[in-house]
Curated annotation (Swiss-Prot):
GO CC aspect terms: plasma membrane
One of the Pfam families matching this protein, by short name: DUF2628
Top-level taxonomic group: Bacteria
Protein's name in the database: Uncharacterized protein YigF
Length: 126
Protein backbone atom coordinates (compact mmCIF):
# COMPACT_ATOMS: atom_id res chain seq x y z
CA UNK A 1 0.00 0.00 0.00
CA UNK A 2 1.46 3.34 -0.96
CA UNK A 3 1.68 6.03 1.66
CA UNK A 4 1.09 9.01 -0.60
CA UNK A 5 -1.23 10.48 2.02
CA UNK A 6 1.80 11.21 4.23
CA UNK A 7 2.86 13.93 1.77
CA UNK A 8 -0.67 15.32 1.38
CA UNK A 9 -0.71 18.81 2.86
CA UNK A 10 -4.51 18.89 3.06
CA UNK A 11 -4.59 16.12 5.69
CA UNK A 12 -3.98 16.93 9.34
CA UNK A 13 -1.48 14.99 11.44
CA UNK A 14 -4.39 13.29 13.21
CA UNK A 15 -5.70 11.87 9.92
CA UNK A 16 -2.21 10.78 8.90
CA UNK A 17 -1.82 9.03 12.28
CA UNK A 18 -5.13 7.20 11.80
CA UNK A 19 -4.32 6.23 8.22
CA UNK A 20 -0.89 4.93 9.20
CA UNK A 21 -2.42 2.82 11.98
CA UNK A 22 -4.99 1.38 9.55
CA UNK A 23 -2.26 0.66 6.97
CA UNK A 24 -0.21 -1.27 9.51
CA UNK A 25 -2.96 -3.12 11.39
CA UNK A 26 -6.13 -2.92 9.28
CA UNK A 27 -9.42 -1.96 10.86
CA UNK A 28 -12.20 -3.98 12.44
CA UNK A 29 -14.77 -5.39 10.08
CA UNK A 30 -18.39 -6.24 10.70
CA UNK A 31 -17.55 -9.45 12.54
CA UNK A 32 -14.83 -7.97 14.72
CA UNK A 33 -11.16 -7.15 14.71
CA UNK A 34 -8.19 -9.33 13.89
CA UNK A 35 -5.90 -10.42 16.75
CA UNK A 36 -3.14 -8.20 15.31
CA UNK A 37 -5.44 -5.16 15.40
CA UNK A 38 -6.57 -5.95 18.96
CA UNK A 39 -2.98 -6.26 20.21
CA UNK A 40 -1.89 -3.01 18.53
CA UNK A 41 -5.00 -1.20 19.79
CA UNK A 42 -4.44 -2.35 23.39
CA UNK A 43 -0.86 -1.08 23.24
CA UNK A 44 -2.08 2.49 22.62
CA UNK A 45 -2.73 5.10 25.28
CA UNK A 46 -6.33 6.10 26.02
CA UNK A 47 -6.21 9.31 23.99
CA UNK A 48 -4.69 7.49 21.02
CA UNK A 49 -7.38 4.81 21.25
CA UNK A 50 -10.08 7.46 21.09
CA UNK A 51 -8.39 9.05 18.08
CA UNK A 52 -8.38 5.72 16.24
CA UNK A 53 -11.76 4.44 17.41
CA UNK A 54 -14.09 7.44 17.26
CA UNK A 55 -14.56 10.79 15.56
CA UNK A 56 -16.21 13.24 17.95
CA UNK A 57 -16.95 15.85 15.27
CA UNK A 58 -18.85 13.19 13.35
CA UNK A 59 -20.88 12.36 16.46
CA UNK A 60 -22.14 15.91 16.85
CA UNK A 61 -22.35 16.97 13.18
CA UNK A 62 -22.90 13.56 11.48
CA UNK A 63 -24.11 14.08 7.90
CA UNK A 64 -22.81 17.66 7.66
CA UNK A 65 -19.29 16.52 8.54
CA UNK A 66 -19.52 13.69 6.01
CA UNK A 67 -20.35 16.27 3.31
CA UNK A 68 -17.34 18.35 4.39
CA UNK A 69 -15.08 15.29 4.10
CA UNK A 70 -16.38 14.60 0.60
CA UNK A 71 -18.34 11.52 1.64
CA UNK A 72 -21.53 12.88 0.13
CA UNK A 73 -23.05 9.48 -0.73
CA UNK A 74 -22.78 8.34 2.86
CA UNK A 75 -23.99 11.76 4.06
CA UNK A 76 -27.22 11.42 2.07
CA UNK A 77 -27.83 7.92 3.46
CA UNK A 78 -27.10 9.09 7.03
CA UNK A 79 -29.44 12.07 6.63
CA UNK A 80 -32.24 9.80 5.40
CA UNK A 81 -31.51 7.32 8.19
CA UNK A 82 -31.65 10.15 10.73
CA UNK A 83 -35.02 11.34 9.41
CA UNK A 84 -36.31 7.76 9.46
CA UNK A 85 -35.09 7.26 13.03
CA UNK A 86 -36.85 10.49 14.03
CA UNK A 87 -40.18 9.24 12.66
CA UNK A 88 -39.81 5.71 14.01
CA UNK A 89 -38.73 7.07 17.39
CA UNK A 90 -41.78 9.33 17.51
CA UNK A 91 -44.09 6.45 16.60
CA UNK A 92 -42.81 4.05 19.23
CA UNK A 93 -41.87 6.65 21.83
CA UNK A 94 -38.14 5.98 21.84
CA UNK A 95 -36.04 9.08 21.24
CA UNK A 96 -32.63 7.43 21.52
CA UNK A 97 -32.57 6.19 17.92
CA UNK A 98 -30.99 9.43 16.68
CA UNK A 99 -28.18 9.04 19.20
CA UNK A 100 -27.62 5.48 17.98
CA UNK A 101 -27.29 6.73 14.39
CA UNK A 102 -24.86 9.46 15.50
CA UNK A 103 -22.77 6.93 17.44
CA UNK A 104 -22.63 4.61 14.43
CA UNK A 105 -21.44 7.48 12.23
CA UNK A 106 -18.85 8.57 14.82
CA UNK A 107 -17.35 5.09 15.02
CA UNK A 108 -17.23 4.52 11.24
CA UNK A 109 -16.27 7.95 9.83
CA UNK A 110 -12.52 7.34 10.21
CA UNK A 111 -12.80 4.07 8.31
CA UNK A 112 -14.94 5.62 5.56
CA UNK A 113 -12.55 8.53 5.06
CA UNK A 114 -9.59 6.13 4.97
CA UNK A 115 -11.33 4.09 2.28
CA UNK A 116 -12.00 7.24 0.25
CA UNK A 117 -8.58 8.86 0.55
CA UNK A 118 -6.26 5.84 0.53
CA UNK A 119 -8.13 3.07 -1.26
CA UNK A 120 -10.22 5.26 -3.58
CA UNK A 121 -13.56 3.75 -2.50
CA UNK A 122 -16.57 6.00 -2.12
CA UNK A 123 -19.64 3.79 -2.08
CA UNK A 124 -23.22 4.19 -0.95
CA UNK A 125 -22.91 1.45 1.66
CA UNK A 126 -22.68 2.19 5.35
Amino acid sequence: MSKEYMNDGSLSEKWKYRFNFYDQHGFPGFWGATPEYKAAFKALKVRQRLTIQMNFIAFFCSWIYLFVLGLWKKAIIVLLLGILSLFVGALIGVNILGIAVAAYVAVNTNKWFYEKEVKGLNTWSL
